[in-house]
A protein has these predicted regions:
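Conserved SAM/SAH cofactor-binding pocket of Class I
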Residues: 39-124
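Class I SAM-dependent transferase core
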Residues: 2-43
């Protein structure tokens, strides 16, 4: 992963345990997704769906804390979904990222069941 570009920054989360590439402008992840991840009582082997995963911070923080989760992120913006995939790969955390709209759930997710479903809606 290229650490940063003119359009992105590389930011540390969990005291530097995760390096996350995110857009330089617009919504930027901060402490909220970290706290969201900390609030999920997930256990190894469970499944987690993050709605509107953005660049993947909440899921990746959760995946770091609880190894061996099956993480899936749903993101409507293709550029953010791509960054989420890159962030998962760079941080060695298995995460499937689906580009799609919650209002029109992608076919592959319609038949899935999850132990936990999380969301961290942005606010401005």
């Amino acid at each position: 992963m290229t650490v940063a570009s003119s359009n992105t920054t590389a930011d540390e989360f969990l005291s530097g345990k995760l390096l996350i590439k995110q857009p330089r402008n617009g919504y930027r992840a901060g402490i909220d997704p970290v706290l969201l991840a900390a609030s999920v009582n997930a256990k190894a082997k469970q499944t987690v769906l993050e709605l509107g995963c953005g660049v993947g911070v909440a899921s990746l923080c959760l995946g770091y804390r609880v190894p061996d989760l099956h993480l899936t992120g749903l993101e409507i913006q293709p550029a953010l979904a791509q960054l989420a995939m890159e962030n998962a790969q760079y941080n060695n955390i298995q995460m499937d990222v689906v580009t799609g709209d919650l209002a029109v759930l992608p076919q592959g997710l319609k038949s899935c069941q999850f132990d936990h479903v999380i969301a961290n809606p942005p606010y401005f």
